[in-house]
Amino acid sequence: MDAPVLYAELNLAETRGLRCTSAPSLPQDACQGPGWHRVALKLGCAGLIFLLMVLSVLVGFLVQKPLIEKCSVAVQENRTEPTGRSATLECPRDWHPHCDKCLFTSQTSRPWADGLVDCNLKGATLLLIQDEEELRLLQNFSKGKGQQFYIGLKYEEVDKVWKWMNGSILNTNLLQITGKDEENSCALISQTEVFSDSCSSDNHWICQKTLKHV
């Protein structure tokens, strides 16, 4: 009677031994784990890059939105005549609407004085920048054109200051002029900065005039 019991115990021990020896086969699946981890990591990185791109676009839009709304308000105010009636505001042909202004960009490059004369002949003046928000919009405008332009700002050697064509002195809190402050220096606007150059240099220019009621 003792023999069968012994056999059963040995059989059970062998079965347990087999189960124990089969356990080392499990790490084969585990060895595949790092591959899946790498794939997941790559997908995660790609998703993060995409989210950052979307975020940058949204930030750019949110920055520009107040500026665009400000222009819309300015235009809407000018659309209302003294009588309270709505009026149509239009720019002349070949001029670009910008807030409450019309802008003209020259097709040729000439010295600053020639640009000033050209604007005067068109019943306009070289561009005047009123505030920092308008500066950013005009830099985007310049970026779209892919050029740099003379504006209505010139260095006055006698007074040692930069002056706009309307006689007002440049507010350095509004913008900083990159380059030299010296006689015969005129300001240009590009997509990134406002800088000085010799007034005798050939450059494009921007004229401005107010929107007209028609």
Swiss-Prot record:
InterPro entries: C-type_lectin-like (IPR001304), C-type_lectin-like/link_sf (IPR016186), CTDL_fold (IPR016187), KLR_subfamily_B (IPR051527), NKR-like_CTLD (IPR033992)
Signal sequence range: none
Keyword list, A-Z: Disulfide bond, Lectin, Membrane, Signal-anchor, Transmembrane, Transmembrane helix
Annotated membrane topology: Single-pass type II membrane protein
Major localization listed first in the record, in broad terms: membrane
Compartments in which it is found: Membrane
UniProt KW Transit peptide keyword: no
GO cellular component: membrane
Domain C-type lectin: 98-208
SMART domains: CLECT (SM00034)
Disulfide topology: C119-C207, C186-C199
GO MF term list: carbohydrate binding; signaling receptor activity
Residues that span the membrane, as ranges: 43-63
Extracellular compartment spans: 64-214
Pfam family, one: Lectin_C
Cytoplasmic topological segments: 1-42
Protein name in the entry: Killer cell lectin-like receptor subfamily B member 1
Organism encoding this protein: Mus musculus
